[in-house]
A protein has these predicted regions:
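Core catalytic alpha/beta fold that binds nucleotide/phospho-ligands
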Residues: 1-147
Length: 147
């Protein structure tokens, strides 16, 4: 989950072996070349970097998988990541993280952040907080009807 005052998209993937030739179906020519030109021990990491950045972007613009991943390119220029898309020329700021061993996470926002803090929440805490929130709202609503 990602929270922002602007549009935001996020993707998290477990790094698992994949036939890198699948990239021909989903990546632009320049992205596929980026993976193929990577050192052999980094190709899988490059694949998942691109995959999570692309997914974060389409989530940010609200297209989900209704947009073909080949229709735009994620580009790297020194320390900057940007998107080339004639169809959706929006301001995007990308952040990528190796959050836990064998996991990649990418974030795409419409607002520049100097830091994007990551807060890990255990599932049971999230569920309990949600239940507490619902109970509080129900209590507030029931007290309004008593007036």
């Amino acid at each position: 989950c990602a929270v922002s005052t602007g549009a935001v998209g996020i993707d998290i993937e477990a790094i698992k072996y994949i036939d890198l030739n699948v990239g021909k179906r989903f990546f632009s020519e320049s992205e596929y070349a980026y993976i193929n030109n990577a050192p052999p021990n980094l190709k899988l990491n490059y694949f998942y970097d691109l995959w999570t950045l692309k997914e974060a972007y389409i989530n940010k613009i609200g297209k989900g998988l209704n947009m073909r991943l080949k229709d735009f390119s994620i580009c790297f220029d020194k320390n900057k990541i940007y998107v080339e898309s004639a169809k959706y020329p929006e301001n995007c700021y990308f952040y990528k993280y190796d959050i836990i061993k064998n996991f990649k996470m990418s974030l795409c926002t419409s607002i520049y952040q100097t830091k994007c803090p990551i807060i890990f929440i255990r599932q049971e805490h999230l569920i309990n907080d949600f239940i507490d929130l619902i109970n509080t709202k129900e209590h507030n609503l029931s007290s309004l009807t008593e007036l």
